[in-house]
């Protein structure tokens, strides 16, 4: 299958495929087949996390794919209860073991959990993991500007990626502007808005014009903005559809029409300032 697609460049000198597959809510016992199918289709970037409970299955799919490790881009994430110098390193070692890998291409802090306020300690350990080579690049998820600024002020090191909720109903322009000013790549989770956009008239009009699905239009919007994007599906036909988005281009008016869908209260997931462990 074709694997040609766009890549993004990180400020640490590395690069990544712009389009990947997320495996949130993919059960561990089917993760291997889903990952192998995605790689067969042409995906080279897989995004998992410790809390997903499927790192073992993801690792099995990678091993069974027959694709050389250096051709793949594998990301996983540190969960909220493992922030801290030693606990972060231990959690990372556990993830590597489950994945069956000796390095990951990207290791991410999953949430800042500011009420606990240990994310800087976690970041300091991740800098060490990067310097040792077991995490080739390091990033964060769900960090607001104040969290990113704290990393910069206290460590001098900014993430290469901030993975955030981002879709046409919740476009986070101010945060994306901060990313652009500091050479941080924006990566979108929930990039399709959890299906709430399928009936949106303007998106359907754009889809008809380009003879594409609404999902393909939204994914192409992300890539034309320069975002990394990780849509999730376990259905082979949908995986194929999501992957084939680089052979058409949205026009300026299309991009403007999608920009107009933004709303101030469009968030589907938790607020990073409030999301925390139950006991925190």
Model-flagged regions — what are they?
Residues 26-29, 47-57, 81-86, 114-117, ...:
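Acidic-and-aromatic substrate-binding clefts and catalytic sites of carbohydrate-active enzymes
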Residues 5, 35, 55, 59-62, ...:
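Generic structural signal for well-ordered alpha-helices
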Residues 26-38, 84-99, 146-149, 170-171:
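Short, acidic/polar
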Residues 112-280:
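Beta/alpha (TIM)-barrel catalytic core signal, keyed to glycine-rich beta->alpha loops juxtaposed to Asp/Glu
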Residues 1-72, 125, 278-280:
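N-terminal binding-site loop/beta-alpha segment at the start of enzyme catalytic domains
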């Amino acid at each position: 299958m074709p694997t040609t697609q766009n890549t993004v460049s990180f400020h640490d000198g590395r690069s990544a495929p712009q389009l990947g597959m997320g495996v949130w809510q993919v059960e561990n016992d089917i993760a291997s087949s889903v990952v192998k199918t995605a790689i067969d289709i042409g995906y080279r970037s897989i995004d998992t996390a410790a809390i997903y409970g499927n790192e073992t299955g993801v690792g099995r799919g990678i091993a069974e794919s027959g694709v050389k490790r250096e051709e793949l881009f594998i990301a996983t994430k540190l969960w909220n209860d493992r922030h801290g110098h030693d606990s972060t390193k231990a959690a990372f070692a556990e993830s590597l073991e489950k994945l069956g890998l000796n390095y990951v291409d990207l290791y991410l802090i999953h949430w800042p959990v500011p009420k606990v306020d240990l994310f800087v300690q976690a970041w300091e350990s991740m800098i060490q993991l990067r310097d040792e080579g077991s995490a080739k690049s390091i990033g964060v998820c769900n960090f607001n500007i104040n969290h990113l600024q704290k990393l910069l002020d206290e460590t001098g090191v900014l993430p290469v990626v901030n993975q955030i909720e981002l879709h046409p109903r919740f476009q986070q322009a101010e945060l994306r502007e901060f990313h652009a000013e500091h050479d941080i790549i924006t990566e979108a989770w929930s990039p399709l808005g959890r299906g709430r956009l399928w009936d949106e008239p303007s998106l359907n009009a754009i889809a008809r014009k380009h003879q594409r699905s609404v999902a393909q239009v939204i994914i192409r919007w992300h890539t034309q903005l320069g975002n990394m994007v990780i849509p999730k599906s376990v259905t082979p036909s949908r995986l194929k559809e999501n992957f084939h988005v680089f052979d058409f281009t949205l026009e300026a008016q299309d991009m403007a029409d999608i920009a107009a869908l933004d709303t101030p209260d469009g968030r589907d997931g938790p607020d990073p300032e409030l999301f925390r462990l139950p006991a925190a």
